[in-house]
């Protein structure tokens, strides 16, 4: 039996290690991105149901809806690209969001305004978003 030994240069070992590390990194990134997408889908579905339960249910009172407006706005800002909306609906919602935020930022004697009513444009935006998530 012959004892032959293969001698590798340090350069070839280094290249092989780098290639192996890059391959492992790509596999890990692929797994993370894939699971992140799944979590994002599940989160989107759960939040959509939550929005529809509050804003799509006629038995929910207007005060509960008003209290949940920040949740609706956060949902829209995070997931607006996933909602099937026409350009006109998108413009209408964006205008309503700006109007709502401007109203919320108004201060009376150094304190944010409390209470208030939901204007027709905000009600329209809510109905468009609810229709899109159902």
UniProtKB/Swiss-Prot annotation:
<comment type="function">
    <text>A humoral factor that may play a role in stress tolerance.</text>
</comment>
<dbReference type="InterPro" id="IPR010825">
    <property type="entry name" value="Turandot"/>
</dbReference>
<dbReference type="GO" id="GO:0009408">
    <property type="term" value="P:response to heat"/>
</dbReference>
<dbReference type="Pfam" id="PF07240">
    <property type="entry name" value="Turandot"/>
</dbReference>
<keyword id="KW-0399">Innate immunity</keyword>
<dbReference type="GO" id="GO:0005615">
    <property type="term" value="C:extracellular space"/>
</dbReference>
<dbReference type="GO" id="GO:0034605">
    <property type="term" value="P:cellular response to heat"/>
</dbReference>
<keyword id="KW-0732">Signal</keyword>
<dbReference type="GO" id="GO:0034644">
    <property type="term" value="P:cellular response to UV"/>
</dbReference>
<keyword id="KW-0391">Immunity</keyword>
<dbReference type="GO" id="GO:0005576">
    <property type="term" value="C:extracellular region"/>
</dbReference>
<dbReference type="GO" id="GO:0009617">
    <property type="term" value="P:response to bacterium"/>
</dbReference>
<protein>
    <recommendedName>
        <fullName>Protein Turandot E</fullName>
    </recommendedName>
</protein>
<comment type="similarity">
    <text>Belongs to the Turandot family.</text>
</comment>
<dbReference type="GO" id="GO:0045087">
    <property type="term" value="P:innate immune response"/>
</dbReference>
<feature type="signal peptide">
    <location>
        <begin position="1"/>
        <end position="38"/>
    </location>
</feature>
<keyword id="KW-0964">Secreted</keyword>
């Amino acid at each position: 039996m012959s004892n032959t030994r293969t001698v590798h240069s340090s350069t070839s070992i280094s290249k092989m290690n780098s290639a192996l590390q890059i391959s492992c990194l790509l596999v890990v990134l692929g797994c993370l991105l894939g699971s992140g997408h799944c979590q994002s889908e599940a989160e989107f579905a759960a939040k959509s149901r939550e929005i529809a339960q509050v804003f799509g249910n006629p038995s929910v009172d207007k005060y509960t809806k008003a209290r949940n407006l920040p949740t609706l706005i956060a949902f829209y800002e995070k997931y607006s690209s996933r909602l099937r909306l026409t350009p006109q609906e998108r413009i209408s919602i964006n205008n309503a969001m700006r109007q709502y935020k401007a109203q919320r930022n108004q201060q009376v004697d150094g304190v944010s305004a409390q209470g208030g009513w939901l204007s027709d444009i905000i009600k329209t935006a809510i109905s468009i978003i609810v229709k899109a998530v159902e």
